[in-house]
């Protein structure tokens, strides 16, 4: 494992919504540079920046038109280089978002691929051999190009799939992964990675990392082979570069080239039971049914989380990091279902479990999900992509543009959380996050790869549903319920309480936890 990942805490930035420095209503790279001190003081020493490459923005930048050009609305390539330099001066690493599975339909590669005559890019994308042919089970578009064929899509209509080949060949137009055209696609993506790494980028979050090869085996044999090939290149040329997969499959990703994978919010999985448990994960107006572990009155035990988490953790913890998120640009903000006190306990827990935690911009102040009309292909996700709320000035300090010209509306509620309002409040969520991350950085026992052991995780019985775990020589304990409890643990005599949220004390060698409390002993 790269040494810098052991103490890494990431901050995810949706660039168009973070901070606008030129008054056009859209956040920019200079805005990120301007807020680096805030990010560092929060306790984050690494960034994941959502797509910032040139794009028509039909899917918020996940439809790339030019992999080697910063989108003009965010700035220039020179701004990207300046961001890398400024971040590194402050001890902050920067990961860009890489979209290797598809491009925009406006990408020059795709425009060339649409031509009827054979050229360098004819097989850069997946085409059938007839304008009347279906996609063999994959979504496809036909009748829009000079070329006699239909092309395969990865997601939206605007995102033609790049050709990495097929694991199982069903049609004569499908190519094996070792076909020269498919190998050329891999090499082209390596070239993109080299371009940004040479400029100072520290690695990539990889979009839809498991989806490269079509008709792959159940264990993604051929896609995994591609990522091992890319990792071999990185290990030789950029040994400190990190890769994190959008996969939620650590048994595959961490053993095949990735340093990290996300523990994503999938309906009914362990993370979902821990933090969310919405009634309909894709609902544009989500209804939390109060069953998440951290909901005070849920009655849900920690076993719902551990039954899913522990087998995968035990199978992969020596290979890399399976990382917790507070939220991301694709999910409903956690404040939609958890109160501030519940968020405090949730953050304390995921910040002290294994892996490198990821904080989504604004979650540190409890920004709210806003039910908004879709923007740039966001649909239900749009409400989690609103401008960062810095203060109580116009547009919450995000931009000097007129309100009707900013990227998305800000939260106009009188009690909308802001950085400025919480900065001087010692009891604020913001300062709770700061103190938690400061404690994490000060104790190597909370490093991403430090030993982890479950000490006490009984099945829920009414309001009795604690969770106690060990990281190195530290013991962490949480009580999400609304009643005080005592834990039947034999504690070493020299153990002292080092950190608390709520009330916690050691009485007669027993740990007593107040209602909705968290403690670290050491």
For each feature predicted by the language model, list its residue ranges.
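Beta-strand-rich binding/interaction modules
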Residues: 484-501
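Conserved alpha/beta catalytic core and glycan-binding cleft of carbohydrate-active enzymes
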Residues: 105-141, 231-387, 392
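A Trp-anchored, charged/polar loop motif used as the substrate-binding/catalytic surface
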Residues: 181-192, 196, 299-310
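Active-site groove signature of glycoside hydrolases
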Residues: 193-215, 324-328
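Loop/helix patches that line or flank the sugar-binding groove of alpha-linked glycan CAZymes
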Residues: 4-6, 235-237, 249, 254-257, ...
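C-terminal beta-strand-rich structural cap/linker in extracellular carbohydrate-active enzymes
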Residues: 507-522
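Acidic/aromatic-lined carbohydrate-recognition and catalytic surfaces
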Residues: 2-187, 198, 209-256, 388
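Short beta-strand segments
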Residues: 12, 48-51, 204-208, 244-246, ...
